[in-house]
């Protein structure tokens, strides 16, 4: 195997692929990246057995075909440390990878390509194409609500659902829920649901960088695959049943609060400073046109903010985890935000003021 490549052309896919590779691995080959040269194309593959990413680069000069695996992090660090527009020469000699650039020479250990595991694929049961920016929006709007290391393993990921042409993302950790939908013109009669694990979602989001580009999605029985011109991403799915999110959405809330998102965000952030560090509870007191936000902590310290809001329901007092409210206000894009409440024991439903494609549910706290 032998090829030459510009530093930038190699570094971009190498950084993406190395992101999938975990530093501490049970199998040494999983710390490696698989390099394959075929014709005028170099492909780089990284995997942790859950998630697999293949990056592709077109080689400008003639290349000798071959395949080998080398330590991903070391190869990436070498590329990063080389000068910007240098030409890198890479060849395999006597089971070592020789990397030459300018006056620099590196020799890396290798493992055979045959040792490199591939993520098994079954047949795809649903294929569709969608703008990268749209899929990125679905992920960005909801990924913060995914659980981390929850024993209910099906919450450590995101539900992607195709139903009647609509693509929807849903994430919940049991305390709050985030949901975003968009019309994707996907020709699917049946409701189709998959749970993509947390790492898969976060890696996929990193790849969706082109504003105008499309991404092809294949949903299978056990895998999701996403393909663009430059990469192919595969992730195993979480085998489990996602909660019925529609039952979680509060119905019949009769108290509507409309406020300035940035004002509320700043007021919540300031109040949070003196909330209980462990439970993060704040108290909201609503009266005509006014929201009073209060927090206190075991040291008997107190914070209080008053924010003008549109509200004409009766007086209401309700407690929330301030971190959950700040997370929601952090992803909402409009200037105004709507809270729909019913009583002090019921969850809040949060929307953008003039847009219903996203919905957020936050459970109340007893204070």
UniProtKB/Swiss-Prot annotation:
GO molecular-function term, one example from the UniProt record: DNA-directed DNA polymerase activity
Function: Confers DNA tethering and processivity to DNA polymerases and other proteins. Acts as a clamp, forming a ring around DNA (a reaction catalyzed by the clamp-loading complex) which diffuses in an ATP-independent manner freely and bidirectionally along dsDNA. Initially characterized for its ability to contact the catalytic subunit of DNA polymerase III (Pol III), a complex, multichain enzyme responsible for most of the replicative synthesis in bacteria; Pol III exhibits 3'-5' exonuclease proofreading activity.
Domain of life: Bacteria
Subcellular location(s) of the protein: Cytoplasm
Protein name, entry field: Beta sliding clamp
Family the entry assigns: Belongs to the beta sliding clamp family.
InterPro entries from the UniProt entry: DNA_clamp_sf, DNA_polIII_beta, DNA_polIII_beta_C, DNA_polIII_beta_cen, DNA_polIII_beta_N
CDD domains: beta_clamp (cd00140)
Keywords, ordered alphabetically: Cytoplasm, DNA replication, DNA-binding, DNA-directed DNA polymerase, Nucleotidyltransferase, Transferase
Gene3D superfamilies assigned: DNA Polymerase III, subunit A, domain 2
Gene Ontology BP term (one): DNA strand elongation involved in DNA replication
Keyword Transcription regulation assigned: no
Subunit structure: Forms a ring-shaped head-to-tail homodimer around DNA which binds and tethers DNA polymerases and other proteins to the DNA. The DNA replisome complex has a single clamp-loading complex (3 tau and 1 each of delta, delta', psi and chi subunits) which binds 3 Pol III cores (1 core on the leading strand and 2 on the lagging strand) each with a beta sliding clamp dimer. Additional proteins in the replisome are other copies of gamma, psi and chi, Ssb, DNA helicase and RNA primase.
Chief location: cytoplasm
Originating species: Pseudomonas aeruginosa (strain ATCC 15692 / DSM 22644 / CIP 104116 / JCM 14847 / LMG 12228 / 1C / PRS 101 / PAO1)
GO cellular component: cytoplasm; DNA polymerase III complex
């Amino acid at each position: 195997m032998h090829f030459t490549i510009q530093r930038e052309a190699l570094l971009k896919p190498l950084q993406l692929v190395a992101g999938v590779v975990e530093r501490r691995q049970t199998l040494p080959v999983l710390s490696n990246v698989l390099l394959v040269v075929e014709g005028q194309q170099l492909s780089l593959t990284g995997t942790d057995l859950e998630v697999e990413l293949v990056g592709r680069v077109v080689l400008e000069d003639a290349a000798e075909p071959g395949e080998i695996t080398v330590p991903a992090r070391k190869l990436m660090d070498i590329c990063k440390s080389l000068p910007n527009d240098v030409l890198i020469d890479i060849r395999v000699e006597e089971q070592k990878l020789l990397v030459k650039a300018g006056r620099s020479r590196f020799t890396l250990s290798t493992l055979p390509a045959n040792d490199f595991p591939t993520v098994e694929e079954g047949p795809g049961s649903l294929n569709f194409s969608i703008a990268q920016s749209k899929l990125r929006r679905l992920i960005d709007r909801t990924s913060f609500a995914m659980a981390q290391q929850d024993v209910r393993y099906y919450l450590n990921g995101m539900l992607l659902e195709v139903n009647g042409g609509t693509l929807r993302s849903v994430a919940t950790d049991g305390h709050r829920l985030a949901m975003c939908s968009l019309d994707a013109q996907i020709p699917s009669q049946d409701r189709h649901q998959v749970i993509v694990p947390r790492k898969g979602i976060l890696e996929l989001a990193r790849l969706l960088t082109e504003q105008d580009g499309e991404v092809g999605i294949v949903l299978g029985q056990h895998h999701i695959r996403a393909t663009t011109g430059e990469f192919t991403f595969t992730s195993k799915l979480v085998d489990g049943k996602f909660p019925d999110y529609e039952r979680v959405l509060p119905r019949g809330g009769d108290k509507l609060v409309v406020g300035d998102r940035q004002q509320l965000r700043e007021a919540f952030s300031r109040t949070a400073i003196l909330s209980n560090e462990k439970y993060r509870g704040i108290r909201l007191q609503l009266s005509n046109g006014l929201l009073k936000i209060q927090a206190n902590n075991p040291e008997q310290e107190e914070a209080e903010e008053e924010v003008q809001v549109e509200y004409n329901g009766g007086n209401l007092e309700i407690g929330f985890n301030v971190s959950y409210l700040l997370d929601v206000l952090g992803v909402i894009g409009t200037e105004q935000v709507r809270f729909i409440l019913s009583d002090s024991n019921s969850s809040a439903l949060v929307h953008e003021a003039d847009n219903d494609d996203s919905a957020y549910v936050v459970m109340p706290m007893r204070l």
